[in-house]
Design a protein with these regions (language model features):
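Flexible, polar/acidic helix-loop-strand segments at domain edges
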Residues: 9-81
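Long, intrinsically disordered, low-complexity segments
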Residues: 2, 71, 76, 109, ...
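Acidic/polar loop patches that form or flank catalytic/metal-binding clefts of enzymes
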Residues: 21-22, 100, 116-119
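Extended, hydrophobic/aromatic-rich amphipathic alpha-helical segments that build helical scaffolds
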Residues: 18, 75-107, 127-137
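Acidic, mature catalytic/reactive cores of soluble proteins
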Residues: 19-20, 29, 97, 147-150
Length: 188
């Protein structure tokens, strides 16, 4: 019923008062076969009945049919207003227009029930805050890799060395074969 799972560390990275927790994660469920109630405890992942926290973003709470992984009865999100606001905040941050950048990210945070980011924040810290906010807001929506590539922060966020070539994509071989003026990226 859910092929997306979260690590306990990511689940616990949300602020306790963040309203997105209840719409992002399945934290409890009732087994339709025996009526038993299960509650997720990120501090007790050894519990075999509910050891992993599943993402709830693509689940229909009224759908109790067992389906194959990836077969969801609700629509996937392509773009959301929060994405527009956070992209705008990121652009303003890169122009060092901190006040303008804070407007968008703080709207997203307010909707999630969180306090605004203070206006005294540095550009570097705001850049990190925007990426973290995008991570929480778009969990399991496929944005993180592109965000980390764009901000060139894969090594920092993943906690390990990342070869520079992974910040770009190679050109398809058949395209470079067809066009001699098209040169492959030097790292590939």
């Amino acid at each position: 019923w859910s092929s997306f799972i979260s690590t306990p560390e990511f689940y616990k990275s949300y602020e306790v008062e963040d309203k997105r927790i209840s719409t992002t994660f399945v934290t409890e469920f009732t087994d339709i076969n025996n009526g038993k109630q299960y509650v997720y405890d990120p501090d007790n992942i050894a519990e075999p009945s509910f050891p992993l926290c599943h993402f709830a973003k693509y689940l229909d709470p009224n759908d109790n049919q067992s389906t194959s992984a990836g077969d969801y009865s609700c629509n996937r999100k392509i773009i959301r207003y929060a994405d527009v606001l956070l992209m705008q905040s990121e652009a303003y941050c890169e122009m060092n227009r901190i006040g303008d950048a804070l407007a968008g990210i703080n709207r997203v945070r307010a909707r999630a029930g969180l306090n605004p980011i203070p206006s005294s924040i540095s550009q570097t810290d705001l850049r990190k805050a925007i990426i973290q906010e995008r991570t929480w807001e778009f969990a399991a929506e496929g944005h993180s890799l592109f965000d980390m590539k764009r901000q060139h922060c894969m090594a920092e966020r993943l906690g390990r060395a990342v070869d520079d070539k992974y910040y770009s994509l190679p050109l398809p071989q058949d395209e470079t074969d067809k066009n001699p003026n098209l040169k492959q990226h030097p790292l590939w």
